[in-house]
Amino acid sequence: MPASRLVPLGAVLLLGLLLLLELPPVTGTGADKPGVCPQLSADLNCTQDCRADQDCAENLKCCRAGCSAICSIPNEKEGSCPSIDFPQLGICQDLCQVDSQCPGKMKCCLNGCGKVSCVTPNF
């Protein structure tokens, strides 16, 4: 490969390394405080509110949202709530308020009628 083609490639690689060094590392795992980070929508502003759980107030966890790191209310149990494609039949009342009210690995999630109940999460 000619040297004239290597110069732009080297410049791009150097720029990439500099950008990586500018972003503070984020644990993203939230291992310091109980619970797990919820599934968050990507924040295009690349907000860096925290680097670790201890940077967040009270029970909030430092969680990744795309290129951002924000303090967020944690989920108590692993997994995410399944999507609801259509209204489902069943009891249309709230059967739980938080994951800890659900047995085993089940989570407290929205059901088909706008209320919440214990369901098997997606992993």
Curated annotation (Swiss-Prot):
Entry GO terms, CC: extracellular space
Main subcellular localisation: secreted
SMART domains given in the database record: WAP
Disulfide bonds: C37-C63, C46-C67, C50-C62, C56-C71, C81-C109, C92-C113, C96-C108, C102-C118
GO BP: any one term: innate immune response
Family matches, as CDD domains: WAP
Location(s) in or outside the cell: Secreted
Domain WAP: 30-71, 74-122
Keyword tRNA-binding: no
Annotated tissue distribution: Epididymis.
PROSITE patterns noted in UniProt: WAP
Residues carrying a glycan: N45
Superkingdom of this protein's organism: Eukaryota
Entry's Gene Ontology molecular function annotations: aspartic-type endopeptidase inhibitor activity; cysteine-type endopeptidase inhibitor activity; serine-type endopeptidase inhibitor activity
Signal peptide extent: 1-28
Keywords carried by this UniProt record: Aspartic protease inhibitor, Disulfide bond, Glycoprotein, Protease inhibitor, Repeat, Secreted, Serine protease inhibitor, Signal, Thiol protease inhibitor
Quaternary context: Homotrimer; disulfide-linked.
PANTHER family found in the cross-reference section: WAP FOUR-DISULFIDE CORE DOMAIN PROTEIN 2 (PTHR19441:SF34), WHEY ACDIC PROTEIN WAP (PTHR19441)
Function: Broad range protease inhibitor.
Protein name: WAP four-disulfide core domain protein 2
